[in-house]
UniProtKB/Swiss-Prot annotation:
It is found in: Cell inner membrane. The gene is mdtD. The lineage of its organism: Bacteria, Pseudomonadati, Pseudomonadota, Gammaproteobacteria, Enterobacterales. The chain crosses the membrane at residues 12-32, 49-69, 77-97, 102-124, 138-158, 165-185, 197-217, 225-245, 263-283, 286-306, 342-362, 396-416, 431-451. It is a multi-pass membrane protein. Keywords: Cell inner membrane, Cell membrane, Membrane, Transmembrane, Transmembrane helix, Transport. One of its GO terms (molecular function) is transmembrane transporter activity. SUPFAM superfamilies: MFS general substrate transporter (SSF103473). Pfam families: MFS_1 (PF07690). NCBIfam families: efflux_EmrB, PRK10504.1. Residues 33-48, 98-101, 159-164, 218-224, 284-285, 363-395, 452-471 are cytoplasmic. Residues 1-11, 70-76, 125-137, 186-196, 246-262, 307-341, 417-430 are periplasmic. It comes from Escherichia coli O1:K1 / APEC. Belongs to the major facilitator superfamily. TCR/Tet family. One of its GO terms (cellular component) is plasma membrane. This is Putative multidrug resistance protein MdtD.
Length: 471
């Protein structure tokens, strides 16, 4: 990319900065949850909604981000995304109650939902096609560093300052990013078709109320009648969307996508698989601190091997799938992740702490292989006219399933535990043991979906589409 103009390189740096902010925030909060609970007077076993409120908002807003960027301009939307994310960070730091924090996290989620997809769109518009892959590699690299730094940085700030600083550090960075965006980013626009507002609202209502209903009386405090009402509203909204999208060329997501068998299998497997995987980044630091008595910084450091394993495996995942095929790889990694989850629980409860980094490294390797395989399986056979829509739907499902996974993990903790817990006590460890056992079972279930993938499905068919897969 050395032959690109200086202005273009600066614009790529701005996009990379946005990727870093968004990826850092998805991991930095996890380590701080027990300290937040103590400060806000809440049970640490009920803090999962801090993550769910952010991830669910991202899932809801993702379908609108690309259309808004084309309609209003990439600079205007990217600037708005950074401002909303920064304001959300400020309000998070100022929150005095859990409800205030949840609202602030939702505002952050609106900004986060627009930052990454609009950043990708910007790269497509400012970089020549032959340099697109190199440019995307450059801007996504900081996004890979964010999860590596997030847990340890979050633990460090919590231990030596306070949890408020995990949000306050975003403010000066956000201000600089917003100013740089206004000064350096071009405001590309495109002619757009009419936005499917009806479909967007139906999907948003369906996803939001079903997730709230899943949280149940343990998390939200809703009565059984209220939960039943939420389920009914959510199901009706999703059924109405299916009716709305049938034979509708302007639908948010065309039902023609599901005529491609591997897309249907991959999407179903991704949804079920990421429910299980979404539990792990939430549960691991909470378990290390509440169940085993680790300090926030120590718990954050323990997450680094998992990220390193994930990053290292990305280099060879194509060769692995080429050698063994999608079905074998996905079934093996799904069952393997379940076994590694049990291994982590066992070694931790036995006090073999020196083994934990190796187990977490292995967990990261297995999880990364499964993620990459799920993404390419889902998108590789789609025709060109449906590839963009399929990628957007996959991105939304990824975020939705992760929010459901965290919700289920919180529900399990509430089911097996109580409002008041003692750090590093036998009773608390029993609560976590039952939760980990349940999680291992849930993580293994998608193997039944992946077993239906045709045995002759191999990676070499998908290499040409890898650039379209969700990150």
């Amino acid at each position: 990319m050395t032959d690109l103009p200086d202005s273009t390189r600066w614009q790529l740096w701005i996009v990379a900065f946005g990727f870093f902010m968004q990826s850092l925030d998805t991991t930095i909060v996890n380590t701080a949850l027990p300290s937040m609970a103590q400060s806000l007077g809440e049970s640490p076993l009920h803090m999962h909604m801090v993550i769910v409120s952010y991830v669910l908002t991202v899932a809801v807003m993702l379908p609108a981000s690309g259309w808004l960027a084309d309609k209003v301009g990439v600079r205007n939307i990217f600037f708005t995304a950074i401002v909303l994310f920064t304001l959300g960070s400020l309000f998070c730091a100022l929150s005095g109650t859990l409800n205030e924090l949840l609202l602030a996290r939702a505002l952050q989620g609106v900004g986060g939902a627009m930052m990454v997809p609009v950043g990708r769109l910007t790269v497509m518009k400012i970089v020549p096609r032959e340099q697109y892959m190199a440019a995307m590699t450059f801007v996504t690299l900081p996004g890979q560093v964010g999860p590596l730094l997030g847990p340890a940085l979050g633990g460090l700030l919590v231990e030596y300052a306070s949890w408020h600083w995990i949000f306050l550090i975003n403010i000066p960075v956000g201000i600089i990013g917003a100013i740089a965006t206004l000064m350096l980013m071009p405001n590309y626009t495109m002619q757009t078709r009419r936005f499917d507002l009806s479909g967007f609202l139906l999907l948003a209502v369906g996803m939001a109320v079903l997730t709230l209903a899943l949280d149940g009386s343990k998390g939200t405090g809703f009565s059984p009648l209220a939960i039943a009402g939420l389920v009914a509203v959510g199901v009706v909204a999703l059924v109405l969307y299916l009716l709305h999208a049938q034979n509708n060329n302007r639908a948010l997501f065309s039902l023609k996508l599901f005529r491609t068998r591997n897309f249907s299998l991959g999407l179903a497997g991704s949804f079920a698989g990421r429910i299980g995987s979404g539990m792990l980044p939430f549960m691991t630091p909470v378990f290390l601190q509440i169940g085993l008595g680790f300090s926030p910084f120590h718990a954050g450091l323990m997450m680094i091997p998992m990220v390193l394993g994930s990053m290292g495996m990305k280099r060879i995942v194509v060769q692995v799938v080429n050698r063994f095929g999608y079905r074998r790889v996905l079934v093996a990694t799904t069952l393997g992740l379940s076994l590694v989850t049990l291994l982590f629980m066992t070694t931790a409860l036995l006090g073999w702490y020196y083994v934990l980094p190796f187990v977490l490294f292995l967990q990261g390797m297995v999880n990364s292989t499964r993620f990459s395989s799920m993404n390419t399986l889902t998108l590789k056979d789609l025709p060109d006219n449906l590839a963009s829509s399929g990628n957007s739907l996959l991105s939304m499902i990824m975020q939705l399933s992760m929010s459901i996974g965290v919700t289920i993990a919180g529900l399990l903790l509430g089911l097996f535990g109580s409002q008041h817990v003692s750090v590093d006590s036998g009773t608390t460890q029993t609560v976590f043991m039952y939760t980990w056992l349940s999680m291992a079972f849930i993580i293994a279930l998608p193997a039944f979906v992946f077993a239906r993938v045709p045995s002759d499905t191999h990676q070499n068919v998908a290499i040409s589409r890898r650039k379209r897969s969700a990150q």
